[in-house]
Amino acid sequence: MNGFFLVNKPEKMTSHDVVFQIKKKFHFDKVGHTGTLDPLASGLLIVCVGKATKLAFLFDKLSKTYQGTFLFNKHYDTLDVKGKLLDTKNIPLNDFAIQTSFASFHQKKYWQIPPMFSAVKIKGQKMYRLARQNQVVDIPPREVFIHHFEKKSLFCHDQVDFLVHVSKGTYIRSLARDLALQLNTYGALLRLQRTAIGTHLLQNAKTIENLELNDLILDSIFFASYDELILNDYLIKLVKNGTYLDQRQIITQKPFIVKDSNKNFVAYYDILDENKYYPRYFF
């Protein structure tokens, strides 16, 4: 079987733990996830099964939505409360100041520096491993976009709840730091829940305990809304051998599905350049 599970990951469990438990529960050979969710965080994790593990890239580029709580005036090495507390401040803050800082990031594109404790690689090594070795490195920033950023509670006891919708590659821990910097203080993540990945919603996810085999979204169902190209038997043989396609065979300008004359799914084609497409996944 090849497809995807929408899983509601609990706090304290790693994304790897989720993969391991699903693999054990259903006796699958190949299982993977589409993007790490920190142990501190709960919420939506998309888990790939079988050949669909090769489709994780489709989810990586999708935007994400989170809700959670920021903590101010405390500096942790990991930028969340699970890390080591390095320093504290006693900067007086209020709702107006917090709201002003929130508004400055709403619908904003900026260059964000990932946390040192992250899986981003520097010269082939993951940064969290360098951090554990107390190595200081220059972290290259990445361009991110904050689609929506909303304060969801009154500021109280140095805490405030939030809702945020962000582009791929955005670290909410870094956003906590950057938000607080505008207030001349420290910021960290106290709580985080991922509620959406693209159009995939947490409300449609299940816990590992409640997950059933019929909850698997088959790869053919996932691609049902894609443009399709039905080819004759001769061209299907070429497709199965990895042949590229161009404007002579297709009229679409976006990724599509190739089917045979019986409308069986054969391959998913992605864009290589303006007039050329290549098979990125075979059913």
UniProtKB/Swiss-Prot annotation:
Enzyme Commission number, as recorded: 5.4.99.25
Q: Which GO terms describe its molecular function?
A: RNA binding; tRNA pseudouridine(55) synthase activity
Transmembrane: present as a keyword of the record?
no
Q: Which reaction does it catalyse?
A: uridine(55) in tRNA = pseudouridine(55) in tRNA
Could you name the domain of life of the organism this protein comes from?
Bacteria
Keyword presence, Transcription: no
- What SUPFAM superfamilies does UniProt report for this protein, alphabetically? Pseudouridine synthase
Can you tell me which residues form the catalytic site?
Answer: 38
Q: List the disulfide bonds.
A: none
Q: Which UniProt keywords apply?
A: Isomerase, tRNA processing
What is one process in the GO biological process aspect for this record?
Answer: mRNA pseudouridine synthesis
Q: Which family does it belong to?
A: Belongs to the pseudouridine synthase TruB family. Type 1 subfamily.
**What is the role of this chain?**
Responsible for synthesis of pseudouridine from uracil-55 in the psi GC loop of transfer RNAs.
Entry protein name? tRNA pseudouridine synthase B
Q: Look up and give the organism this protein is from.
A: Aster yellows witches'-broom phytoplasma (strain AYWB)
